[in-house]
């Protein structure tokens, strides 16, 4: 699969992928690796994990990693990621859970939807 085209489309849209996580040591590596295939602008928010999630995420370069010690809930993690994305100049964000329920393979569909919504204006 040619991922470069998706990376370029996301860059043109100024779109990042935000991954909130909490105690997902068994799935976080697979999720981040698959998202990085599609997108260079990955923001991971570690919501106070008490397992080895932070160790795994610490091994990555090329992701934006935000972490706090106390679990504050998924909503707070999403808001943190969205605020960060806005501060960094992104106009759009795609959120994917880190437990493996959502798949990076869905990113092209999200890109299509964003581009289609732009055509309405």
Each language-model region and where it sits:
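N-proximal low-complexity "stem/linker" segments adjacent to membrane-targeting elements
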Residues: 1-34
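Short hydrophobic beta-strand elements that form part
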Residues: 16-20, 43, 67
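Substrate-positioning beta->alpha
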Residues: 27, 102-110
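Short beta-strand/loop segment that forms part of the nucleotide-sugar
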Residues: 32, 40-49, 66, 96
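A conserved acidic beta->alpha catalytic loop
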Residues: 46-55, 100
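Conserved donor nucleotide-binding strand/loop of the catalytic core
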Residues: 54-88
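Short beta-strand-to-loop acidic/aromatic patch adjacent to the donor-nucleotide binding site
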Residues: 90-101
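Conserved donor NDP-sugar-binding/catalytic core segment of glycosyltransferases
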Residues: 108-121
